[in-house]
């Protein structure tokens, strides 16, 4: 029998502004994807700490050795877009450590609406915004909102408390994105997480 070298793990990015719920989304996605048999690992990016990585390692949701941290310095977008070599190296190290790895999740440091991922780093990426940031975020048409493969609007439970018209915000997001997918979530409560996992599966894991 001829030996077959396994394909490299699929690589996805999760970006968005500070406090939008990126880490909370990952914490909810990990058990859902693992329950579907997905072998995964996570690379976090913080400015000068490893705070998000340590949070995931302490969570009990994933083997701590499957979480790597990249310290991005003053510009979190640089290490996911202009020069992603640190993240690429971290991903390669995890693939070498876990040969059966199917999915690598790269969490960007908190950034602004201009944050995007290099396609040298990821195959597909999610941008997370939240209703507390205001329902005008989709109208501002930042590159993160427009170019991501999936836009997640998080913290939808807060909409009535911050005066946001959630249905209008979702409709505006769908309009400016030209029909590309938008999913509403409450990551802390687990609402919408299965839909995000489904989107990841269809896009990069080739599940129905």
From Swiss-Prot:
Gene transcribed to yield this protein: ureG2
NCBIfam families in the record: ureG
InterPro entries referenced in this protein's UniProt entry, alphabetically: CobW/HypB/UreG_nucleotide-bd, P-loop_NTPase, UreG
PANTHER family tied to this protein: UREASE ACCESSORY PROTEIN G
Function: Facilitates the functional incorporation of the urease nickel metallocenter. This process requires GTP hydrolysis, probably effectuated by UreG.
Complex formation: Homodimer. UreD, UreF and UreG form a complex that acts as a GTP-hydrolysis-dependent molecular chaperone, activating the urease apoprotein by helping to assemble the nickel containing metallocenter of UreC. The UreE protein probably delivers the nickel.
Organism whose genome encodes this protein: Methylobacterium radiotolerans (strain ATCC 27329 / DSM 1819 / JCM 2831 / NBRC 15690 / NCIMB 10815 / 0-1)
Pfam families in UniProt: cobW
Subcellular location: Cytoplasm
Binding residues annotated for GTP, in chain numbering: 16-23
Protein's recorded name: Urease accessory protein UreG 2
GO BP terms: urea catabolic process
Family recorded in the similarity comment: Belongs to the SIMIBI class G3E GTPase family. UreG subfamily.
An example Gene Ontology molecular-function term: nickel cation binding
């Amino acid at each position: 029998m001829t030996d077959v070298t396994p394909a490299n793990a699929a690589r996805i990015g999760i970006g968005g502004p500070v406090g939008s719920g990126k880490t909370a989304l990952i914490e909810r996605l990990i058990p859902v994807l693992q329950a579907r048999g997905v072998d995964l690992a996570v690379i976090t990016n913080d400015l000068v700490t490893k705070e998000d990585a340590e949070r995931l390692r302490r969570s009990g949701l994933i083997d701590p050795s499957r979480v790597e941290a990249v310290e991005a310095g003053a510009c979190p977008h640089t290490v996911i877009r202009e020069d992603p070599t640190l993240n690429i190296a971290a991903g390669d190290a995890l693939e070498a450590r876990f040969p059966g790895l199917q999915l690598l999740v790269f969490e960007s440091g908190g950034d602004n609406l201009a944050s995007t991922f290099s396609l040298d780093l990821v195959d597909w990426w999610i941008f997370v915004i939240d209703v507390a940031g205001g329902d005008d975020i989709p109208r501002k048409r930042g590159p993160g909102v427009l170019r991501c493969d999936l836009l997640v609007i998080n913290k939808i439970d807060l909409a009535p408390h911050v005066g946001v018209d959630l249905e209008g915000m979702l409709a505006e997001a769908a309009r400016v994105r030209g029909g590309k997918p938008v999913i509403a979530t409450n990551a802390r409560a687990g609402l919408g997480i299965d839909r995000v996992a489904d989107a990841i599966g269809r896009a990069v894991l080739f599940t129905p």
